[in-house]
Amino acid sequence: MTAETSTKGKKSRSNKRMTGDKSAPSKGEQAKARIISAAESLFNKQGFDGASMRDIAAAAEMQPASVYYYFESKEELLWAVWEKGGLELLHRVADAIANKTDPWQRMETACVAHTTGLLDWRRANQALFIMPPWHYPESIRARVIALRDEYEKIFIGLIDDLPLRKGVDRRYLRLTVIGALSWSLFWFKKERDTPASIAKQMLSMLRAGIED
């Protein structure tokens, strides 16, 4: 190998490090993902109080010490689960409406994305997203509320743009829409409905009574 070839090889490897090779997650990222996935499942089956860190470690096929290496407490692990789902849902809705311009089409698209996202991630959402914020540990409560508020800002903007008849309270409309769609987590039957059909039917019924 010539000195020039060796130098080129070093530069190539250096460039990869500088730009970041995102072809595969690191071992640490894989381990955290396994822990979060195990926690999602156990928080849903056993509840937050019922699932111990030892249980989560066993489900992730890891030692308890390894779980604590990545998450200093069960509360921080709960936040990781909530943040993962919350950000996925936020980005799903934001991306879905990005190229839409008609106010009602944007609203319908957001409702479909919201419902689809909740039902795609159903096992954890039943235990997490329906839980009132005051039920969360105090150490993470403010973060949960902040992320929830950031998500709801999307719907605040969408509803502000809708042509509604006089007297319709837009805050109540937002709470009604998000609440009704989210409750589908408990009664959804895939052999009977689709997430899109649920969202469209509910919004259509509301629209009939509120549109200007």
Q: Where are these predicted regions, by residue range?
A:
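Helix-turn-helix
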Residues: R34, A38, L42-E76, A80
